[in-house]
Amino acid sequence: MTLKPMIRTTLRFAVALSALAMAFASTPSAAQTQGCNVVVQSDDALRYLPHAIEVPRTCKDFTVTLTHSGRLPVLAMGHNWVLSKQSDMAGVARTGMLAGAENHYVDPSDRRVIAHTKVIGGGQASSVSFAVSALQPGETYAFFCTFAGHSPVMQGSLVLQ
C-alpha cells in the first residue's frame, strides 16, 4: 500500500470514528424532564431515547409521552411504554404477550404494571400519567415495550429523585 491510499484510508476511518463519537456524545443518558413530563422517542430500530428517566419526587403526577418516528405500521413495528419494578419486568412482558393486541400487550389485571401507554405505530404518539406516590425511594424501575419480542432490547430505567 502506498502512502496516499494509506492516508486516504486513515482519514476515512478518522471521519467515521468522529461521526460515531459525536452521535454518542449527543445521546442523553438520562432524560431532561420538563417539570413533571418527559417525551420518550421510539422508532423502527427497536430503541427508546432517552434510556433513563429521572422523576422528581416533588411531582404529584408524572406524564410520559411516547412518540414513534418510524414509518412502519403498528402491526409490523408497534411500540408501547410499560413501567414496572425491574424485578417484575420479565413476568409483565410474558403476561402482556398473552393479553394480546386488543389489550395493547398489557394484562389489564396485572397489578405489577404501574403505568402503560397504548401500542402505537409510525407517526403516532400516546401519553400516560401516573401518581409519583406509586414509586418507592431506592426501588429500581424499568420501562420496556411488550410488543412481540421487543422487551429484551427495548428497555430503560426510571428512578425517583
Task: Give the location of each predicted region.
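Extracellular/periplasmic metallocenter environments
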Residues: A115-Q161
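Bacterial N-terminal signal peptides that target proteins for export
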Residues: T2-A16
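C-terminal segment of classical bacterial N-terminal signal peptides
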Residues: L20-S29
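Short, solvent-exposed loop/turn elements at domain surfaces
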Residues: L46-P50, L72-A76, A90-V92
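N-terminal edge beta-strand
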Residues: Q34-D61
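Extracytoplasmic/periplasmic copper-protein system
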Residues: Q32-D43, S84-V106, A148-Q161
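Beta-strand cores of secreted/periplasmic/IMS beta-sandwich domains, seen most often
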Residues: A52-A76, W81-L83, S127-Q136, T140-Y141, ...
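Short beta-strand and strand-turn-strand segments in soluble, beta-rich domains
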Residues: N103-A115
